[in-house]
């Protein structure tokens, strides 16, 4: 195994048929009839989601902005980076989408944006096609009162970057995109 070498470009899987079995504004579930790499037939369920976006928003005091909310699927409260989804209908670029999400969730804008991911990263590649981009956002300024979705009950706080990184390494921040963002930002800031 060599992660620096190109992987095969031809899929060993064969899709026989595909049908949408569920859709809402946030996800689509697709069921594919497939032939696996070993030649066995079967079905494969795929959750389709838009490109996810996240930002390590760092202020002049080296505090990171975190957003807290109850995560219904996990049944627990979660502290996370400002995150959202790219909306091709509303956002010209993924960065425009992240700027929108940062303002909506936190009431902040950033003057300095650095892309932390060299390409989209897969978030759970055995069940979903969801990928994500992450940025380091600095030179934060207030824009307005946050105007998040009416279904969201968000709390926004700032904590020292090192404390947030320690929380991620200890599992107290366990959102995958947030953990990755903090690790990548730590490396970028060295």
Briefly describe each language-model feature range.
Residues 28, 50-51, 58-59, 71-73, ...:
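Active-site segment of metal-dependent pyrophosphate-handling enzymes
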Residues 2-13, 77, 117, 125-128, ...:
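Nudix hydrolase/Nudix homology domain
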Residues 32, 62, 102, 160:
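Terminal peptide-recognition signature
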Residues 34, 57, 66, 136-137, ...:
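Conserved hydrophobic "DFG−1" position in protein kinase catalytic cores
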Residues 41, 76, 110-112, 177:
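Short secondary-structure junction motifs
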Residues 2-5, 10, 44-47, 54-100, ...:
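Conserved Nudix-box catalytic region and its N-terminal flanking loop in Nudix hydrolases
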Residues 13-54, 60-61:
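Acidic, metal-coordinating catalytic segment for phosphate/diphosphate chemistry
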